[in-house]
From Swiss-Prot:
InterPro entries: DNA-dir_RNA_pol_bsu_ext_1_sf, DNA-dir_RNA_pol_bsu_external_1, DNA-dir_RNA_pol_su2, DNA-dir_RNAP_su2_dom, DNA-dir_RNAP_su2_hyb_sf, RNA_pol_bsu_bac, RNA_pol_bsu_CS, RNA_pol_bsu_protrusion. The RNAP catalytic core consists of 2 alpha, 1 beta, 1 beta' and 1 omega subunit. When a sigma factor is associated with the core the holoenzyme is formed, which can initiate transcription. The keyword Transcription applies. GO terms for molecular function: DNA binding; DNA-directed RNA polymerase activity; ribonucleoside binding. Its EC number is 2.7.7.6. The keyword Transferase applies. This is DNA-directed RNA polymerase subunit beta. GO terms for biological process: DNA-templated transcription.
Length: 1357
């Protein structure tokens, strides 16, 4: 087994027993793949699939003019290069996007000719706005901020059958319904009412009898009856009636006459119910015709019109009940055949027949008019408009589209063979749906489960962007149609026809303000990954929080391996926002799939098959943990399996598939919780969610007890620097890494240099600090995919959200009552939970009515000391330490002119403008913020002179860029000459600098040559001369391209910035604030065990063990039993063992033991106790010593979810670390020195500091701003608001009879305007009296009552 550069430095002891069949897939692929398919940027034009942008254009074009004489066709599109790269976009606050250019063809036909002859063709590229590009980490930069488009889980298009669960009618009768949901277009519902008639609704409007829809489709009444019913045939012979008998149809009827066979033997007596036995006897006797009395026909319903044979007059219409009167007419007319509908109450109800009776329409036109009236009430219908409306509803490709998914689901549900077909409905589609609905009502077939993941599909970024794009194009289409008619006469070009604004607006609106376009959660790498893998049922076209019931939110059996059953927010969104399971992916239709291993005759293979929830139900699926022997054969007699969404047991030979990994059930966040299998689900949910809120600490520390998923999350999150290609590290400093790529990975003409600029102290969306630290040294060899630099919350390429703390479970003087946490002062001293937060403060200089605002150090009425930290431009220096009230950017605003006296006017006219008054509007540090200025950015409008500071910043940027380019060139040049040297060494020359014909080149010559002299060599071998020429050409080309890039960068930097109207200059100041941990901060473990720090106590007061080592944190043991998250206790024990082993290794290193001895001990740890074996023999002695040095602080362990360390193994580990296997020790009280009366569980737990810091929440106000109407203080820290003294608080004061306190609360401390200003003045003068007056809110009440027309006046008392 090969270890990567970082892995071999610190190997995790893995307790997993199950084989790794399949690696964890790339975690962001759902975002990247979806958007890649949308853009198809790197696909050749002719190879583009009909998806994404291509499909959107194809669906709207060609656009034909109203007259049909001109058409605009779509040819292809291409995306240009973005103007700014990602970093520049974030800095400048612009969108990272590429211009979209579409090639269209305008065709004008000849009006005069009878056939369509083409008169003119014009082709042109048209600019269609900008399309946002996705960064390589699956995010979008919109207006300078990183955003994520969350995938949406919505109801798949298709047909669904359901019932109302008996809620509609008081009798509790189940009313069945069918609904055809298209991808876009009108919904079509069929539903039963309590009287068993079938109705239809279009777009949830008022209902009509379903037969109206069938009539509108062109079916007559008898055709409808023929489609939905079987007929019974009666023949009339000599006044007697004979029934063509189908024996099974009599079942359950009560015989109203005796039934005999042809020989006259009695089969059923009169008055008896016909049973299955009777039917068998009739079939045996071969009874084909049965003589029935005429009364048997009464109440039967005719299937066709019965007409008099002689006159042709209809005696009995179809679908009417036969009465005595009708029988008389039939006999009179001498009719020989009567067809009636066969119905019964069991499995063949008379639903369509009953519906036809309540249907008042008689012809297709009447039906169309009826539908028109329902859709457009109040508009007078005409034949054309009624027909148009109906055809556009379901049969027009422009208005209606089932989509490929919808058609596939539709055909599957109706049991058809083919899965493809038209996007619009056909007549047979509607009839089949109605027929299936009636079958379900008749008891054949079942209703659908709408929460089944086979009926819900995922819409990812690409698809949603495509829909928005199509919306924009449809708007464009309307405008183009109108202009096309002009194009015929005026010879316009395509560019004049298309206005791209609507497209750009639709796309911008989607990315900027859609409910699913969210501000990226950037607290730490895990929160980024989770955000991109989130699946939401909310959003446009989805559910709303208020309407979503319990079933939608619940865990469904089909979630297994597709959606995580654990990770979902607490609160109103629970169950509506989910996370993808670790191995899940979406298929072409958008359904979630999960991977399984194939099992053949009880033998588990390594073939992997992805299945969606629909396909999965037919298989028998064993769990990943099922016992197998070394050949991969299932050993148990009965295996736990899933089959048809149920858990059961089956013999091994029936098993067809097996899970890939135990963690395929849960999401990434849940799979990071060690011993997850020992935690209660509710606490695991909190654990998953709180890991996302962990703030990156100053020094990241890997968890001693992990799950093995940490490495995947860190690498896939994109916060680390990962080597794009293998090679040798040439130079490293704090801000960049340069790698010379190895020859086998470079393509011809490629530089073979990779420069990685590290992100230094950048602000994240959550104001945490993003900083990358290099891991490599000069001369190190790295392979593709190795981690070169750690990001925030990453330690040696592993996710590290918190710190390993030494904890004890014991009470301590009530300081850990109710989940409080007691912390040692040492934790603060060692900066274990110190975090850096970066605030961005912005100062905007605008052009006002009175003149421009100015950024300057010349501020009126400000002392020298306040300006000490500002430079000449009035902007603070980088590195300055600032505190509340300090000026960051000096700015002055022109004040309104006072009225001038005539004398002053005269003087001003004579002596010129006197500097008009200005007021100080500088940007100052807000209250409660102390920190260091780490960066300043100045943006200046085009045409405004840049200040000195802006020029300096610009120059620094350019110099940095120049250095990168020079280094790149140096390495390329070095590599080129290296290649030439090896090719030319020992070859003979014809001529050259200081050489004569026939000389042989040696090392001495090469060292003496100047660089340009190499290319003056004339070699005897022609091929070598070509090589020299080519090398010279390549270097010149490279030099030119580097100069071009430099000039391009210079142009970008020196051009003015595109600022909002009226803005002249923007100065952004970044202040880094160091936050140490303090009482009131929220901390948590990974098992949902959260708490608030109650106190920080001196080290000497903390409990200590027999060696004198104090604990760092004291937790309350009562937090464990009721919460049932025992995982934290197991983690504590295993953490203790890991730390103990680290101490043991540390002692060995201190005693300078031989590498062989250390290797032997490492073998015991890694390969002696349970879990996977590590290949330590592949490491050299020096690598073993590096590994040991990295294990000094503890041996990291991995206990994968559902496949983790067993209790026995934890005990063995504790013994190996020379510790008591109970995991408990004697502790002594730090204050008295006495031993506690029983042993205490002490170990190491991984604790996180969450982004709920007391600094951000603590707030106090004396006076401040007030609400405009009520004049009451505002609320909340952001508005600098007051504390609300609410209704209940008033009751409390009333209960105590504290009348004066209550009076001041309701008046001078709230909204009595005069009273409070007077009181403020009095307090300033040292006088503490107050005069309460009328609260403003009372005046508001009086005004509101008056506005109702009721006069109300206050009487003076």
């Amino acid at each position: 087994m090969t270890y990567s550069y970082t892995e071999k430095k610190r190997i995790r002891k893995d307790f997993g027993k199950l084989p790794a069949v399949m690696d964890v897939p790339y975690l962001l692929s759902i975002q990247l793949d979806s958007y890649h398919d949308f853009l198809q940027q790197d696909v050749a034009i002719e190879d583009r699939q009909e998806v994404g942008l291509h499909a959107a254009f194809k669906s709207v074009f060609p656009i034909v003019s109203f007259s049909g004489n001109a058409a605009l066709e779509y040819v292809s599109y291409r995306l240009g290069q973005p103007v700014f790269d990602v970093a520049e976009c974030q800095l400048r606050g612009v969108t990272y996007a590429a211009p979209l250019r579409v090639k269209v063809r305008l065709i004008i036909y000849d009006k005069e000719s009878s056939t369509k002859a083409i008169k003119d063709i014009k082709e042109q590229e048209v600019y269609m706005g900008e399309v946002p590009l996705m960064t390589e980490n699956g995010t979008f930069v919109i207006n300078g901020t990183e955003r994520v488009i969350v995938s949406q889980l919505h109801r798949s298009p298709g047909v669904f059958f359901d019932h109302d669960k008996g809620k509609t009618h008081s009798s509790g009768k189940l009313l069945y319904s069918a609904r055809i949901i298209p991808y876009r277009g009108s919904w079509l519902d069929f539903e039963f009412d309590p009287k068993d008639c079938v109705f239809v609704r279009i777009d949830r409007r008022r209902k009509l009898p379903a037969t109206i829809l069938l009539r509108a489709l062109g079916y007559a009444a008898d055709e409808m009856l023929e489609m939905f019913f079987e007929n019974s045939l009666f023949e009339v012979e000599g006044g007697e009636y004979f029934l063509d008998l189908v024996p099974s149809r009599l079942r359950g009827d009560i015989a109203i006459f005796e039934i005999k066979d042809d020989e006259g033997n009695l089969i059923v007596e009169e008055g008896r119910r016909v049973t299955a036995r009777h039917i068998r006897q009739m079939e045996k006797a071969g009874l084909k015709r049965l003589r029935v009395p005429s009364s048997y026909l009464l109440g039967k319903v005719t299937a066709t019109n019965i007409a008099d044979p002689s006159t042709g007059e209809v005696i009995v219409e179809c679908n009417t009940e036969i009465t005595d009167d009708a029988i008389e007419k039939i006999e009179k007319a001498g009719i020989k055949r009567i067809e009636t509908l066969y119905t019964n109450d069991l499995d063949c109800g008379p639903f369509v027949s009953d519906t036809l009776r309540i249907d008042a329409t008689r012809s297709q036109l009447e039906a169309l008019v009826e539908i028109y009236r329902m859709m457009r009430p109040g508009e007078p219908p005409t034949k054309e408009s009624a027909e148009n409306l109906f055809n556009n509803l379901f049969f027009s490709e422009e208005r209606y589209d089932l989509s490929a998914v919808g058609r596939m689901k539709f055909n599957r549900r109706l049991g058809r063979e083919e899965t493809e077909g038209l996007g619009v409905l056909s007549h047979s589609d509607i009839i089949d749906v109605l027929r299936t609905l009636i079958d379900i009502r008749n008891g054949k077939g079942v209703v659908d489960d709408i929460d089944h993941l086979g009926n819900r599909r995922v819409r990812s970024v690409g698809e949603m962007a495509e829909n928005q794009f199509r919306v924009g194009l449809v708007r464009v289409e309307r405008a183009v149609k109108e202009r096309l008619s002009m194009a015929e006469s005026e010879g316009l070009m395509p560019q004049d026809l298309i206005n791209a604004k609507p497209v750009a607006a639709a796309v911008k609106e989607f990315f900027g303000s859609s409910q699913l376009s969210q501000f990226m959660d950037q607290n730490n790498p895990l929160s980024e990954v989770t955000h991109k893998r989130r699946v939401s049922a909310l959003g446009p076209g989805g559910l709303t929080r208020e309407r979503a019931g319990f079933e939608v939110r619940d865990v469904h059996p089909t979630h297994y391996g597709r959606v995580c059953p654990i990770e979902t927010p607490e609160g109103p969104n629970i169950g509506l926002i989910n996370s993808l399971a670790t191995y899940a992916r979406t298929n072409t239709y958008g359904f979630l799939e999960s991977p399984y291993r194939k099992v053949v005759d009880g033998l588990v293979t390594d073939d992997i098959e992805y299945l969606s929830a629909i396909e999965e139900s037919d298989y028998v699926i064993a769990q990943a943990s099922a016992a197998v022997d070394e050949n991969g054969r299932l050993i148990d007699e009965l295996v736990t399996v899933r089959h048809k969404n149920e858990f059961t047991v089956m013999p091994p030979e029936k098993v067809t598939l097996m899970d890939v990994s135990p963690r395929q059930v849960v999401s990434v966040a849940a799979s990071l919780i060690p011993f997850l299998e020992h935690d209660d689900a509710n606490r695991a949910l909190m654990g998953s969610n709180m890991q996302r809120q962990a703030v990156p600490t100053l020094k990241a520390e890997k968890p001693l007890v992990g799950t093995g998923m940490e490495r995947y999350v860190a690498q896939d999150s994109g916060v680390c620097v990962v080597a794009r290609r293998g090679g040798v590290v040439v130079s490293v400093d704090a801000a960049r890494i340069v790698v010379r790529v190895s020859d086998d990975e470079t393509e011809a003409g490629d530089a073979g240099v990779d420069i990685y600029n590290l992100t230094k102290y950048q602000r994240s969306n959550q104001n945490t600090c993003i900083n990358q630290r290099s891991l490599v040294m000069e001369g190190d060899e790295v392979a593709r995919g190795d981690v070169l630099a750690d990001g925030p919350s990453v330690d040696l390429g592993e996710l590290a959200l918190g710190q390993n703390m030494r904890i004890a479970f014991m009470p301590w003087n009530g300081y850990n009552f109710e989940d409080s946490i007691l912390v040692s002062e040492r934790v603060v001293q060692e900066d274990r939970f110190t975090t850096i937060h970066i605030q961005e403060l912005t100062c905007v200089a605008r052009d006002t009515k009175l003149g421009p605002e100015e950024v300057t150090a010349d501020i009126p009425n400000v002392g020298e000391s306040a300006l000490a930290k500002l430079d000449d431009s009035g902007i603070i220096y980088i590195g300055a330490e600032v505190e509340p009230g300090d000026i960051l950017v000096g700015k002055v605003t022109p004040k309104g002119e006072t009225q001038l006296t005539p004398e002053e006017k005269l003087l001003r006219a004579i002596f010129g403008e006197k500097a008009s008054d200005v007021k100080d509007t500088s940007l100052r540090v807000s209250t409660g913020m102390r920190g260091t200025v780490i960066d300043v950015q100045v943006f200046t409008r085009d045409g405004v002179e840049k200040d000195q500071r802006a020029k300096e910043i610009e120059q620094t940027e350019l110099n940095k860029f120049r250095k990168d380019l020079n280094d790149e060139y140096k390495i390329v040049e070095g590599a080129t000459f290296e290649r030439l040297r090896s090719a030319l060494l020992g070859q003979s020359v014809i001529g050259g600098p200081g050489l004569k014909k026939g000389d042989t080149l040696t090392e001495v010559h090469f060292n003496a040559f100047e660089k340009e002299e190499w290319f003056k060599l004339n070699m005897a071998d022609e091929q070598l001369n070509e090589l020299l020429e080519k090398a010279e050409g390549q270097l010149q080309e490279r030099r030119k391209s580097i100069e071009d890039r430099y000039e391009d960068k210079k142009r970008k930097l020196q051009s003015g910035d595109d600022l909002a109207p009226g803005v002249l200059k923007i100065v952004k100041v970044y202040v880094a604030v160091k936050r140490r941990i303090q009482p009131g901060d929220k901390m948590a473990g990974r098992h949902g065990n959260k708490g608030v720090i109650s106190a920080i106590k001196p080290v000497e007061d903390m409990p200590y063990d027999e060696q004198g080592n104090p604990v760092d944190i004291v937790l309350n043991p009562l937090g464990v039993p009721s919460r049932m998250n025992v995982g934290q206790v197991l983690e504590t024990h295993l953490g203790a063992a890991a730390k103990g082993l680290g101490d043991k290794i540390n002692r060995m290193l201190a005693e300078q033991k031989q590498a062989a001895e250390i290797r032997k001990f490492l073998h015991e740890i890694y390969n002696g106790i349970g879990g996977r074996n590590e290949d330590l023999d592949s490491l050299s002695d020096s690598e073993v010593l590096v590994l040991a040095a990295n294990l000094k602080k503890g041996v990291p362990m991995a206990t994968p979810v559902f496949d983790g360390a067993k209790e026995k193994e934890i005990k063995e580990m504790l013994r190996l670390a020379d510790m008591d296997d109970s995991g408990q020790v004697w502790l002594y009280d730090g204050r008295t020195g006495e031993r506690f009366e029983r042993q205490v569980t002490v170990g190491y737990m991984y604790m996180l500091k969450l982004n709920h810091l007391v600094d951000d929440k603590m707030h106090a106000r004396s006076t401040g701003s007030y609400s405009l109407v009520t004049q009451q203080p505002l609320g909340g820290k952001a508005q600098f608001g007051g504390q609300r003294f609410g209704e209940m608080e008033v009751w409390a004061l009333e209960a105590y009879g504290a009348a004066y306190t209550l009076q001041e609360m309701l008046t001078v401390k709230s909204d009595d305007v005069n009273g409070r200003t007077k009181m403020y003045k009095n307090i300033v003068d040292g006088d503490h009296r107050m005069e309460p007056g009328m609260p403003e809110s009372f005046n508001v009440l009086v005004k509101e009552i008056r506005s109702l027309g009721i006069d109300i006046e206050l009487e003076a008392n």
